[in-house]
């Protein structure tokens, strides 16, 4: 059950974080009405409980009345799901209508604008449908049955963002929108056909751009668009991307429309390029080419010379050539906005190199055109008067050929970009009909002998299907095209496209355990969780939908592929999901996954119920944190068994001094527990954000203190030493901390070890010559060994060797890891030659695996509460480093030059 309401009074319960907090007038999404007058709901992306007395009770009554009436209309409705997020939802259509409406509600102040936009969109759709019908009629005359059937087929799988309109517009309009997007398939086909690539195609494109602008503004009412953006119907004045391509990737869209973002972004990219391409091809310059350059006869030139109009005509030509060059430059610039290997765009049939080759060819032709235009500019009318007009005519012919070639490249470029983009996103429901000639060509085709990684065999298979499923076509295109990757001799992937990586992930003929770990550790830098699940789920449904009778080897592979699919998802959800389950966005994402598993996966694979139960548990307990638990042992220090800090015999002793009364080994043990507790709760996403800044949105709002003891422990040690007035007592305290370091090294707590050694090497302590001079040789030798271990020389080589050979448990020094990650970020590009740098992610995973290894085994010490509280209190206290240094100068003032010389002479044995 889910509906939206408004708070009528403030509510806050600071004693329990499970309760919701809101103010009067806030919008609340009620998930469930509980017993005893309480509700479970979401407000400001936070979820919790609140009393029903704080909201408008009429909303509850109205909702229940409409809900029960819907039950009466659907007596065969299924029972509610086993968790409260899905309670009382009749079916997925009900959820799409009411759930999306609740999340994406628009404030009343914008209702007028919303209605106007809906009306504009409605009229545009009508105009597009009328134009599409006219285009269809013209195509029928050409006998292209595949296109006719395509435009007349209303797709069942359309872009997901029109579903938002479903909350306010009827189903007939949604069907019309679906038909409009299906008509996008005409663009590449029309560009191939000279007889129909004319006024109808241009009009069709203009209307599509208008519709796209309306949808963009509908989703982004917060963006200030140019004044002409909504009102103008002139294609040349519509810049589909007013400011920047990344405008649609803002946080506001991601927070409210995360599941819609990839579709919208892809659609924007496609329409942006098609806009620039058609803007080029419908430019006035092409009319110039038809009207002026075709009249390049000798008589025409001589006539212009006689009328003294040749110079003006030449200037007009040069001006139009300049406009053409500028227009082509804008088109090339628009193409730069699309990264062919990014997760926001879909795989292409052609490689990125094929597209780049067209760009290079276009650039080369533009350069030639520019040089020839310079030659044309240098020809004067007097040259023609001297019977030298043939050079002028030859240049006109050359320009004409060059312009026709440029136009052909632009059309081909647009066709390739648009068509290849539509393959994966839109080309899902086309069911082509074969003519007799095509059928006869395929009669002798043996599908079982086809190499399935060959595109020709794939096309032959698709053409033989009488009515292929949309999902089947989409996944065949996805699985077997655009799989580009560079594999080293040792079998490791260096660079690859996202398609190649995901296909490799799903392979069952190799041992890809480490590869899976690399991908799941770093997938958030390549693709969103929602997109990844959609792709993996589509693969599974594709395997399930294949006709095993016709494809003999698929039935043999079905269970292996299914098991691989389930294993990946189980590992992903249990250990590698980056989203925190503390907002409505993540909850709805899990809900979507639950429904897919319940409907499509469990019926084919009973073992998937384990994952279904895990998802149900997460939905029941959205505040569950996925973190390692500190292991607890049974060892207890007998030295402190009867120690009671609360009954200290001397109340004058400061708490800092109480620490010095404890045995150094016990202090080291308790520091190990504290340090490991902090270290084990650091999530991998906090390390990944050091490399990919865009992952900061996944980092917990209340971050674990990464350096829980580092700075505080350094200041505590330095202050404790300089607080002692007498040199001998300072020496004893110094020796005490060196002993603690010895035990920390023995227990492999390098984090605390580095902190204390850093404190002993700090200026306030290092300058205390008298204090250091009183240390015995054994303690001093021990310090030298520890100091060499923590030295930064040769990139911490001594420490790295020691860490490699140490036995768990261990708390490493995190500073070295962060340094390594920083070097990886600055020294390795994220993408290389339009492909993902997978080698960079492999190196990152090795670091994360090492950290995870140390996080997996805890210390088998029982924490002593009194000691833990004491250490937490004295270490976490804020200290002023300037005061510490001044105190160091007080206890051991600086030596004068005479005193320093006298000390050196005494130390050398002269006196």
UniProtKB/Swiss-Prot annotation:
N-terminal Ras-GEF domain ranges (all copies): 489-623
GO molecular function: guanyl-nucleotide exchange factor activity
SUPFAM superfamilies registered for this protein in UniProt: Ras GEF (SSF48366), SH3-domain (SSF50044)
SH3 domain: residues covered: 1-60
Cross-referenced InterPro entries: Ras-like_GEF (IPR008937), Ras-like_Gua-exchang_fac_N (IPR000651), Ras_G-nucl-exch_fac_CS (IPR019804), Ras_GEF_dom_sf (IPR023578), RASGEF_cat_dom (IPR001895), RASGEF_cat_dom_sf (IPR036964), SH3-like_dom_sf (IPR036028), SH3_domain (IPR001452)
Name of the protein described by the UniProt record: Protein ste6
Transferase is among the record's keywords: no
One of the GO BP terms on file: positive regulation of pheromone response MAPK cascade
Species per Swiss-Prot/TrEMBL record: Schizosaccharomyces pombe (strain 972 / ATCC 24843)
């Amino acid at each position: 059950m889910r509906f939206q309401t408004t708070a009528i009074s403030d509510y806050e319960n600071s004693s329990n974080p499970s309760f919701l907090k809101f103010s009067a007038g806030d919008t609340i999404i009620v998930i469930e009405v509980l017993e005893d007058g309480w509700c479970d709901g979401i407000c400001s992306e936070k979820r919790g409980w609140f009393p029903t007395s704080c909201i408008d009770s009429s909303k509850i009554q109205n909702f229940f009345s409409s809900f029960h009436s819907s039950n009466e209309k659907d007596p065969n409705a299924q029972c509610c799901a086993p968790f409260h997020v899905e309670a009382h939802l009749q079916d997925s259509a009900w959820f799409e209508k009411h759930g999306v409406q609740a999340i994406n509600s628009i404030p009343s102040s914008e209702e007028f604008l919303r209605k106007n936009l809906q009306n504009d969109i409605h009229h545009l759709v009508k105009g597009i449908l009328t134009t599409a019908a006219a285009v269809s009629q013209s195509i029928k005359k050409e006998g292209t049955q595949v296109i006719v059937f395509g435009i007349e087929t209303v797709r069942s799988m359309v872009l997901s963002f029109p579903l938002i309109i479903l909350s306010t517009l009827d189903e007939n309009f949604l069907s019309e929108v679906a038909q409009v997007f299906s008509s996008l398939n005409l663009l590449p086909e029309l560009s191939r056909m000279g007889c129909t690539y004319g006024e109808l195609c241009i009009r069709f494109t203009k209307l599509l751009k208008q519709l796209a602008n309306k949808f963009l503004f509908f989703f982004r009412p917060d963006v200030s668009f140019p004044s002409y953006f909504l009102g103008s119907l002139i294609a040349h004045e519509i810049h589909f991307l007013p400011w920047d391509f990344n405008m649609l990737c803002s946080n506001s869209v991601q927070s409210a429309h995360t599941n819609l973002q990839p579709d919208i972004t892809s659609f924007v990219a496609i329409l942006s390029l098609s806009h620039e391409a058609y803007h080029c091809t419908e430019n006035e310059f092409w009319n110039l080419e038809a009207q002026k350059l075709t009249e390049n006869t000798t008589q025409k030139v001589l006539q212009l010379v006689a009328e003294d109009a040749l110079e003006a005509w030449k200037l007009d030509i040069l001006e139009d050539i300049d406009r053409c060059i500028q227009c082509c430059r804008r088109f090339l610039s628009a193409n730069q906005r699309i990264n062919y290997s990014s997760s926001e765009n879909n795989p292409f049939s052609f490689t990125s190199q094929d597209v780049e080759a067209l760009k290079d060819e276009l650039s080369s032709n533009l350069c030639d055109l520019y040089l020839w235009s310079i030659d044309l500019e240098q020809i004067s009318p007097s040259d023609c008067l001297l019977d030298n007009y043939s050079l002028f005519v030859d240049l006109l012919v050359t320009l004409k050929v060059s312009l026709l070639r440029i136009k052909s490249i632009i059309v081909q470029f647009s066709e390739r970009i648009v068509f290849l983009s539509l393959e994966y996103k839109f080309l899902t429901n086309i069911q082509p009909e074969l003519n007799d000639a095509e059928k006869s060509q395929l009669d002798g085709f043996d599908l079982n002998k086809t190499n399935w990684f060959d595109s020709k065999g794939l096309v032959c298979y698709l053409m033989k299907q009488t009515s292929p499923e949309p999902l089947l076509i989409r996944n065949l295109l996805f699985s077997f095209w655009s799989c580009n990757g560079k594999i080293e001799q040792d079998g490791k992937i260096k660079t690859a496209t996202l398609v190649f990586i995901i296909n490799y992930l799903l392979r069952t003929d190799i041992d890809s355990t480490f590869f899976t770990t690399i991908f799941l550790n770093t997938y958030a830098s390549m693709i969103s969780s929602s997109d990844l699940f959609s792709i993996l789920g589509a693969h599974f449904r594709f395997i399930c939908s294949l006709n095993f009778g016709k494809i003999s080897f698929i039935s043999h592979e079905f269970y292996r592929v299914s098991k691989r699919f389930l294993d990946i998802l189980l590992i992903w959800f249990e250990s590698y999901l980056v989203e925190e389950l503390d907002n409505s966005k993540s909850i709805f994402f899990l809900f979507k996954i639950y429904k897919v598993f319940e409907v499509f996966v469990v019926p084919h694979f009973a073992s998937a119920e384990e994952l279904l139960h895990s998802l149900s548990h997460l939905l029941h307990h959205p505040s569950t944190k996925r973190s390692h638990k500190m292991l607890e042992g049974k060892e207890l220090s007998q030295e402190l068994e009867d120690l009671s800090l609360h009954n200290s015999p001397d109340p004058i002793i400061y708490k800092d001094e109480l620490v010095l009364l404890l045995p150094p080994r016990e202090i080291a043990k308790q520091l190990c527990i504290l340090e490991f507790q902090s270290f084990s709760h650091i999530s991998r996403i906090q390390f990944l954000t050091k490399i990919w800044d865009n992952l900061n949105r996944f980092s917990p709002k209340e971050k674990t203190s990464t350096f829980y003891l580092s700075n505080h422990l350094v200041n505590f040690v330095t202050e404790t030493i300089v607080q002692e007035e007498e040199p001998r007592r300072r020496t004893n305290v110094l020796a005490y901390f060196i002993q603690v370091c010895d035990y920390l090294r023995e227990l492999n707590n390098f984090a605390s070890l580095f902190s204390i050694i850093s404190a002993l090497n700090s200026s306030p302590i290092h300058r205390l010559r008298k204090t250091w001079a009183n240390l015995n040789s054994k303690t001093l030798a021990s310090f030298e060994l520890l100091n060499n271990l923590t030295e930064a020389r040769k990139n911490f080589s001594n420490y790295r060797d020691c860490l490699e050979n140490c036995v768990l448990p261990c708390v490493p020094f995190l500073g070295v890891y962060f340094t390594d990650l920083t070097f990886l970020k600055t020294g390795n590009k994220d993408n290389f030659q339009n492909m993902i740098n997978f080698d960079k992610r492999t190196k990152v995973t090795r670091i994360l695996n090492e950290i995870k290894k140390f996080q997996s085994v805890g210390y088998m010490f029982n924490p002593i509460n009194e000691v833990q509280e004491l250490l937490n209190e004295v270490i976490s206290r804020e200290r002023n480093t300037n005061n510490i240094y001044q105190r160091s100068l007080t206890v051991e003032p600086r030596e004068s030059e005479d005193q320093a010389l006298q000390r050196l002479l005494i130390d050398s044995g002269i006196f």
